[in-house]
Amino acid sequence: MSSYTMQLRTYIEMWSQGETGLSTAEKIEKGRPKLFDFNYPIFDESYRTIFETHFIRNFYMREIGFETEGLFKFHLETWLMINMPYFNKLFESELIKYDPLENTRVGVKSNTKNDTDRNDNRDVKQDLTSNGTSSTDAKQNDTSKTTGNEKSSGSGSITDDNFKRDLNADTADDRLQLTTKDGEGVLEYASQIEEHNENKKRDTKTSNTTDTTSNTTGTSTLDSDSKTSNKANTTSNDKLNSQINSVEDYIEDRVGKIGTQSYARLVMDYREALLRIEQRIFNEMQELFMLVY
């Protein structure tokens, strides 16, 4: 009950007095926009509603420290505009300091540079000897059969020309100059001469058929033995000069939770850090209310 001015709840509930059955939280939610109908700086816009609700609940039963609610709202706005930039920095530092889901952050950076010079000299001597023996035994049987048929025919004409002369010679006084049957030579003497000249012509026709069959059987055997012997000597020299330069950059960031502390505990610590800043704000805002209880 108010003794000097008016309680903050009177102003908040004034905006829902025509409605019945509302809870305190519902009444606060209806009156909150009427109380904070001005702008002021805050670190996170999503936190504005939470901060205003906590303010009303913290001073819900307290009497305002000014004659009228209008004067109270004026000084409330002035206080927030002057002091909230400072407290916003505290809120932001807590956000940087506390990630609600991690309790460790480790960063490792390393740079490694290696320069290596390598000289290799290698002498290699190799003797190779190989002996080989090969044997070949081959036998081949060949059989062949040849069958042939040859047939020939021919026709022609044969002419026989026969000349015959019979001479009888006695002693004579006169000489004859006669040629022989072939017209060559001279017969100088004959007592009696008989000549016969015969011409014969006949036609000829021949036909010949020949069948041939031949069988050939052969066997060949090949035996061969060979031996080989190879020797090789090799000598080599290898030289290798190499230079290796390597640079390694290693960057590691480890972020997370280490230890037995649960995620629920981490979130609770984060919220408590914000509430501690709120409590400092509300302690300093006591000057806006009557210092009587």
Swiss-Prot record:
Region annotated Disordered, chain positions: 106-166, 192-240
Main localization, broad class: virion
Compositional bias of kind Low complexity: 206-231
An annotated GO cellular component: virus tail, tube
Record's subcellular location: Virion
Compositional bias annotation for Basic and acidic residues: 112-126, 193-205
Stretches with biased composition (Polar residues): 127-160
GO biological process: symbiont genome ejection through host cell envelope, short tail mechanism
Keyword DNA-binding belongs to the record: no
Keywords for this protein: Late protein, Viral genome ejection through host cell envelope, Viral penetration into host cytoplasm, Viral short tail ejection system, Viral tail protein, Viral tail tube protein, Virion, Virus entry into host cell
Family: Belongs to the phi29likevirus proximal tail tube connector protein family.
Biological role: Forms the proximal part of the tail tube.
Protein name: Proximal tail tube connector protein
Species this chain originates from: Bacillus phage phi29
This protein's encoding gene: 11
